[in-house]
Swiss-Prot record:
PANTHER family: ELONGATION FACTOR TS (PTHR11741), ELONGATION FACTOR TS, MITOCHONDRIAL (PTHR11741:SF0). SUPFAM superfamilies: Elongation factor Ts (EF-Ts), dimerisation domain, UBA-like. It is found in: Cytoplasm. It comes from Azotobacter vinelandii (strain DJ / ATCC BAA-1303). Its main location: cytoplasm. It holds the Pfam family EF_TS. HAMAP family: EF_Ts (MF_00050). Belongs to the EF-Ts family. This is Elongation factor Ts. One of its GO terms (molecular function) is translation elongation factor activity. The gene is tsf.
Length: 289
């Protein structure tokens, strides 16, 4: 068996990110063979990753990449359990490598990316002690595609017919700030309109009580029209110049907004509420496993 030197332990620590005692034990078990020790630790890491899989990952990062000719772009969301991990270099590297893979392979769905990156994901989970997941991915191709990334938490892709990359980015910035639900009023679903009507009637029950039916209908119509304008990108006042609507801005530049995609970290994920004492107890219990 090769001698287990301090230098060997140090090298294994640097290559795996694991603790000194874990590295020493792995080297002893592997007979001093560092490559075998790494393989064994990865196998062990896969087990740890499986244990972490049930933990809710609602933090993380959004990443975007646009082609040099602005004809295509990809946006992905990768989740972690804490925002702290999302700011660490190992996590950032995993996100960047995943984005490059998705872009290079022209992926339109997250499933093949998840499968391809599973080994790297398990290694990251084993190293950082948090659950990590590639959640979703969207690829957009068109005449002019632009993107905007707000920090690491909000990302937007905008697809234009006509126009230019600068306009696409400006509109993407607006989408990030204003969070429109639909492109235009014609795309608003009947379910969304019905829900808005129901909410309006419930909130204004006292005001409309005893009023004639036609008056109530006009009140509802006014609220629905306001909702359609607020929820539709093309009808929203442009954030940089509220005097012009986003749709008009595009039209003046000889462009038409074809579609947009907006990702925000953790949206739609139900995050469990855990009190601090319980969280500490859970971490202590996990450290003893």
């Amino acid at each position: 068996m090769a001698e287990i030197t301090a230098a060997l332990v140090k090298e294994l620590r640097e290559r795996t990110g694991q603790g000194m005692m874990e590295c020493k034990k792995a080297l002893v078990a592997a007979g001093g063979d560092i490559e075998k020790a790494i393989d064994d630790m990865r196998a062990s890491g896969a087990i740890k990753a499986a244990k972490k899989a049930g933990n809710i990952a609602a933090e993380g990062s959004i990443a975007v990449k646009v082609s040099d000719d602005n004809k295509a772009a990809v946006i992905i969301e990768v989740n972690a359990q804490t925002d702290f991990l999302a700011l660490q270099e190992d996590f950032k590297a995993f996100v960047a490598e995943s984005l490059e893979k998705a872009f290079a392979d022209k992926l339109t769905d997250a499933a093949p990316l998840i499968a391809d990156r599973e080994s790297a994901r398990e290694a990251l989970v084993a190293k950082c002690g948090e659950n990590v997941n590639i959640r979703r991915l969207t690829r957009v191709e068109g005449d002019v595609v632009g993107a905007y990334l707000h920090g690491h938490r909000i990302g937007v892709l905008v697809n234009l017919k006509g126009g230019n990359p600068e306009l696409a980015k400006e509109i993407a910035m607006h989408v990030a700030a204003s969070n429109p639900q639909f492109l235009s009023p014609s795309q608003v679903s009947e379910e969304a309109v019905a829900k808005e009507k129901e909410i309006f009637l419930a909130l204004n029950a006292d005001k409309i009580a005893g009023k004639p039916e036609n008056i109530v209908e006009n009140m509802v119509k006014g609220r629905i029209n306001k909702f359609l304008a607020e929820a539709s990108l093309v009808e929203q006042p442009f954030v940089k110049d509220p005097e012009i609507k986003v749709g008009e801005l595009a039209k003046k530049a000889g462009a038409e907004i074809v579609s947009f995609v907006r990702y925000e970290v953790g949206e739609g994920i139900e995050k469990a509420e855990v009190d601090f004492a319980a969280e500490v107890a859970a971490q202590l219990a996990a450290s003893k496993q």
